[in-house]
Amino acid sequence: MQIFVKTLTGKTITLEVEPSDTIENVKAKIQDKEGIPPDQQRLIFAGKQLEDGRTLSDYNIQKESTLHLVLRLRGGAKKRKKKSYTTPKKNKHKRKKVKLAVLKYYKVDENGKISRLRRECPSDECGAGVFMGSHFDRHYCGKCCLTYCFNKPEDK
């Protein structure tokens, strides 16, 4: 019987085969006509790839059926190397926890009276508990940017 093999280029080859012929035999005949090695050939019929060990009758291939020839692609994508960094990774900044840190903002005199060492920001935006930074010539609030300047550096 006669079957047709359509290649990727659109060329159609006619082959004389028997229903009892194996797929390997068909690939060998294609190699004789086209010169494509059988290990690079993939034959497809009715959307299925034909396996080498089976016969044409197993796939119900009858006379004047058309097989599609596709070339086998070997391998896959190139394996990527793992990145190696030359400089070590920076450690994340950890805030130091100081026990009883609030005590540095207050002073207790010999009578037991508590007085503030830092000035508290009077702005409504900041609220209670926000202290102003003490500089040599001014008090400065880091939250709302309120600044009180001294006339003379001695007037702290």
UniProtKB/Swiss-Prot annotation:
Phosphoserine PTM sites in chain numbering: S65
Keyword annotations: Acetylation, ADP-ribosylation, Cytoplasm, Isopeptide bond, Metal-binding, Nucleus, Phosphoprotein, Ribonucleoprotein, Ribosomal protein, Ubl conjugation, Zinc, Zinc-finger
One Pfam family from the record: Ribosomal_S27
Entry's Gene Ontology molecular function annotations: structural constituent of ribosome; zinc ion binding
Gene3D superfamilies (alphabetical): 6.20.50.150, Phosphatidylinositol 3-kinase Catalytic Subunit, Chain A, domain 1
Linked residues for Glycyl lysine isopeptide (Lys-Gly) (interchain with G-Cter in ubiquitin): K6, K11, K27, K29, K33, K48, K63, K107, K113
Record site feature (Essential for function), residues: H68
Keyword Cell division: no
GO biological process assignments: cytoplasmic translation; ribosomal small subunit biogenesis; translation at postsynapse; translation at presynapse
Residue list for modification ADP-ribosylglycine: G76
N6-acetyllysine, modified sites: K104, K113, K152
Covalent cross-link Glycyl lysine isopeptide (Gly-Lys) (interchain with K-? in acceptor proteins) as placed by the record, residue numbers: G76
Residue intervals of the Ubiquitin-like domain: 1-76
Other known facts: Ubiquitin is encoded by 4 different genes. Uba52 and Rps27a genes code for a single copy of ubiquitin fused to the ribosomal proteins eL40 and eS31, respectively. UBB and UBC genes code for a polyubiquitin precursor with exact head to tail repeats, the number of repeats differ between species and strains.
The family this protein is said to belong to: In the N-terminal section; belongs to the ubiquitin family.
Protein name per the record: Ubiquitin-ribosomal protein eS31 fusion protein
